[in-house]
Each structure stands twice: as C-alpha cells, then as structure tokens.
A protein has these predicted regions:
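C-terminal helix-rich "cap/oligomerization" subdomain common to oxidoreductases
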Residues: 1, 9, 69-71, 283, ...
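N-terminal Rossmann-like dinucleotide-binding module
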Residues: 1-49
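Short, Asp-centered acidic motifs that coordinate Mg2+ and/or phosphate
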Residues: 33, 53, 69, 149
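Conserved SAM-binding strand-loop segment of SAM-dependent methyltransferases
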Residues: 51-58
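Beta-strand-loop-alpha-helix segment that lines the small-molecule cofactor/substrate pocket
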Residues: 64, 68-69, 75-76, 80-128, ...
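Glycine-centered short loops/turns at secondary-structure junctions
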Residues: 90, 117, 142, 241, ...
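Predominantly a Rossmann-like dinucleotide-binding segment in NAD(P)-dependent oxidoreductases
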Residues: 119, 126-227, 232
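Contiguous beta-strand/loop segments that form the cofactor/metal-binding neighborhood of enzyme cores
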Residues: 184-306, 346-363, 377-381, 395-402
Length: 402
C-alpha cells in the first residue's frame, strides 16, 4: 500500500487555494488543513474546498500530530524562519518562493534539513516551464554544443495585478511591503536558467534603476526594505566558465499576463530564444519556430468563479496548463482534468513534493538547489546597492546523494 500523509497549508491567500485542490486530489495526500493570520480566510477556504479543518495558528498546526507536512504560502520575506520552524517541529516543508532573503536564513534551512532528514522543497515554477524543460532536454542531448551564455527575465509590471496582490496581502500598510526589492525575488529568472544549465553562479555585478512613479511605492521613506529600485539587471559568472544575465522589472511596457518569465540560451552549435509569444531554435543552418512546442494549453476560463479574488491581469498565471514538451505520463491521473498554472508547473510541483515525502527521496528543487536559485539574487541586490561592484557568491555545494 502506498504511503500517504497529511498536509497543513500556511496562508489562505491567492495562491494556496489553487494548490489545496491539487494536494487534496493527489493519491499520496490524506488530509489537508489550513491556517491563516486572518482566521476568516482560513475558514472560508476550508468551507469552499471541504478541507479537513483549520488551526488557530501556525504554532498550533506544528504541535498537532494530525499534520505530517506543511506548505508555506505566506508573504515572500517571511519564508526562511517559518521553514526552519516547521522542520524543527518534525514536519516536511514545501515553501513558495523565495527560499529566504538572507544568506544566514538559507544556511539555517540547509542545516535543518541535514539534521532532521526531512523533506524540503521550494516551489519554483520556472524549473518546470516549457522553455526550461526544452532547454534541459537539448542540453542533455548535446544539441547546444558548449553552452556559454543564457538570459532569464521576470518582467512583471506593477500595474498588471501587483497593486491588488499587495493590497490583499499587506492590508492598510501595503505600500511598506509593495516596495519589495526585485532582486530579492530572483528565482523566476534564475531558476529557469539554472534549471536547464547544471551549473551555479559564482560572482555578480548588478545595477538597479530608481523608481520615478512617485506614488509611495518604491519610496525609501515608506519601504520596509529601504528600497527605491523597481527595475534591476544582474550579470552572473558561472562555475566552469560562462555567464548569464537576469532582468527583474516591475515598471515595464510588456504584456506580463502573456508570459512573465522568458529565457534564452546560447551555445557553440545552437541557440534558443523566447519572447512573449514566439520561441525560436537556431543553429548555423537556419531557424526553426518552436512556439507551439512551448505553448501551454489553458485549463480554466479566466472568469471562473474560483478566480474571483484574483486580479484579472494575474489570472493567466493560474490557468495555463501543460505544453506539448511536458511529459505528463508520470503524473497521477487524478490531475488530468484539474486546473494548472504558471505554464503547466503546478501539477509537477505538487507531484514532486508528494513523491519526495512518500519515497523519502530528494525533490528536484531541494534545499541545495533552492539556495543556488535564490542566493544569487540576494548577493546581486547587495551589488546593486553598492553601485554595481562585483561580488562573490557563496555556495552551499551539491545536494547529498541520499
């Protein structure tokens, strides 16, 4: 008989409701509970989806023997301490991105995983994006030749849904946290590059652009993070030779709702480039349009009632399903007709975490990989604050074999 486990959702915001449906449907998950700082949100989600119950606090959830694992869907700067707290309480942990926002927080997570032997996984969507999957396959086949350069963009304008999202999560003082530094949210760009190119960043130089909107967001006098930068670019050196560049843009004339993360890879024999609606494979003989191979199929109508609390500009991220390049054969059949999201990644994220817990194996985006997706942005942020000075990026090494 297959092992099953129970799961507690931490946070009942815009994201967790989409994932609770998938966790409940997975044959490896027995019961799903939820807690939120606003109890009415937890009660509303539990009632809407028929969850097993609610807890009055995260601490109460961790103390309960009814919960074997937790999935953290809280504000992005809160993850590090919550993850360590969960592992220390004996729970397996799935966490939304980013892993953490300081080097010390990441080190603490890795130490806790090593000490407890419990599962930790960061839910990085771009690891499963069609472009990343295709590039990963082509790299494995040697089609690029020697890969020497790549680019990853996370281009999401604040006007396209982010104001509503920050108001929803931040309450009346939402502007304090809407100024969250772009480079401290690096994984949708870095993860798509390093999810295909098996290397890691060793140094970085980054430049930030000060915001000029003047609406109290990205205002250092208001910002909890002392941040006035809304757009930033980072150039990374990688181990073994080569480089990659990322863009983190929050004020940009670009249709973020069509494709907010996009990637490009360049090798000595071939290259691949992705834009909002077009993707190309190129070699020394010519160009092949691979757009259809990487195009996700919608799994939910944008006006579905389950998306009513999500800004219209953000709904595409919660409806985009698998692309032809995805191999769905390993997914549970229970997912076949369920909503997906973020270019088909949600089904794979849930299945990889559940599989890791039930088989006691390392998930693809384990603590060591998560650090390599997150830490480059933390150091890049510091480089930008120092005017672009080149800084070395520490590394926690490869994940253990078992």
């Amino acid at each position: 008989m297959r092992m099953t486990f129970s799961l507690g959702l931490v946070g009942a915001g815009q994201f967790s409701g989409q994932f609770s449906t998938l966790f409940q449907a997975h044959p490896g998950v027995r019961d799903v509970y939820v807690t939120d700082l606003l109890p009415e949100r937890a009660e509303r989600l539990a009632a809407a989806q028929g969850l097993a119950g609610t807890f009055p606090s995260y601490e109460a959830m961790l103390e309960s023997p009814a919960v074997d694992a937790v999935a953290i869907f809280t504000q992005r700067w809160t993850h590090g301490p919550l993850v360590v707290q969960g592992l220390a309480a004996g729970k397996h942990v799935y966490s939304a991105v980013p892993m953490a926002i300081t080097v010390d927080e990441m080190a603490a997570i890795i130490d806790a995983v090593r000490a407890t032997g419990l599962t930790y996984m960061m839910g990085e969507t771009s690891h499963y994006h069609p472009a990343t999957v295709h590039a990963r396959n082509q790299i494995a086949a040697g089609a690029f030749g020697r890969l020497f350069y790549a680019e990853g963009d996370y281009v999401h304008d604040m006007d396209l849904g982010f104001y509503d999202a920050y108001r929803y999560s931040g309450g009346e003082n939402w502007k304090e946290t809407a100024s969250y530094p772009p480079l401290l949210y690096p994984t949708h760009a870095v993860g798509g590059v390093l999810g295909a190119w098996r290397t890691h960043a060793v140094s970085v130089s980054a430049i930030g652009v000060r915001d000029e909107r003047g609406d109290g967001v990205f205002d250092r006098s208001v910002s909890r993070f002392d941040n006035d930068v809304s757009n930033a670019t980072a150039l990374f050196e990688v181990a073994g030779g080569g480089s990659f560049r990322t863009n983190e843009f929050r004020r940009v004339g670009y249709p973020s709702h069509i494709r907010e993360s996009r990637f490009r890879f360049f090798g000595t024999e071939a290259s691949m480039e992705q834009l909002a609606t077009v993707a190309l494979w190129q070699d020394k003989k010519g160009v092949e349009d691979i757009s259809e191979l990487l195009e996700p199929t919608p799994t939910l109508a944008p006006d579905d009632p389950s998306l009513a609390h999500i800004a219209p500009e953000l709904r595409a991220a919660f409806t985009s399903g698998s692309a032809p390049v995805h191999d769905r054969s390993r997914l549970p059949r229970e997912f076949d007709h369920l909503h997906n999201g973020h270019e088909g990644s949600h089904h794979f994220l849930v299945d990889d975490f559940v599989t890791a817990v039930t088989t006691r194996t390392l998930p693809p985006v384990n603590a060591w990989v998560a650090a390599r997706y997150t830490l480059p942005g933390v150091i890049a942020h510091e480089s930008a604050r120092q005017g672009g000075v080149r800084l070395e990026i520490p590394d926690f090494g490869d994940a253990p074999e078992a």
